[in-house]
Amino acid sequence: MTEAQEPEYGGPSVPQTRTARHRRIVDILNRQPVRSQSQLAKLLADDGLSVTQATLSRDLDELGAVKIRNTGGELIYAVPSEGGFRTPQAPLGGSAKEERMRRLSAELLISAEASANLVVLRTPPGAAQFLASAIDQAELHDILGTIAGDDTLMLISRDPSGGQALADHLLRLAQNDR
């Protein structure tokens, strides 16, 4: 059994598994430009994941990572996006991610109900996971996590009584009121 290690940034512990390592690699590549495998290895080590260059090379290959030119002209690693977009793209800025969440909320959100720190969102059939992905990628600090089914999402607020404020915020986004 592998032990979880506590990362330096004080976040949740990360298990030493292939799946956890792949998730961290994707998170890092989506969060910031990474120019080399050695830079990526250092960022993973900062999160408590020690990897060899051979393992990292294999992981990048399994994830479909390629080097692309970002808007600044630098060659950086990128992975294919979730949601069917197989062409790797440079990470979106925070405002682009929030705009995507706003647009998808306006298109897909049918209702939002809150109870304590929970929010239940309803969408058309088949759309819940798409909206959940946009909410996750927006990395809103108030949201601890999302769970999505076919037409229902559950959001968990960090604030024990923050569900109603979160539901109201998402409903305002859906109505294009900022």
Swiss-Prot record:
- Region Disordered: which residues? 1-20
Q: What is one GO cellular-component annotation here?
A: cytoplasm
Q: Which UniProt keywords apply?
A: Amino-acid biosynthesis, Arginine biosynthesis, Cytoplasm, DNA-binding, Repressor, Transcription, Transcription regulation
Subcellular location(s) of the protein: Cytoplasm
Q: Which GO terms describe its biological process?
A: L-arginine biosynthetic process; protein complex oligomerization; regulation of arginine biosynthetic process
Any one Gene Ontology molecular-function term assigned to this protein's record = DNA-binding transcription factor activity
Principal subcellular localisation of the protein: cytoplasm
Named in its record, the pathway it takes part in is:
Amino-acid biosynthesis; L-arginine biosynthesis [regulation]
Per its UniProt record, what PANTHER family does this chain match? Answer: ARGININE REPRESSOR
Protein purpose: Regulates arginine biosynthesis genes.
HAMAP family, per database record: Arg_repressor
Family (UniProt): Belongs to the ArgR family.
Query: Which NCBIfam families does the record associate with it?
Result: argR_whole, PRK03341.1
Name the UniProt record assigns to this protein? Arginine repressor
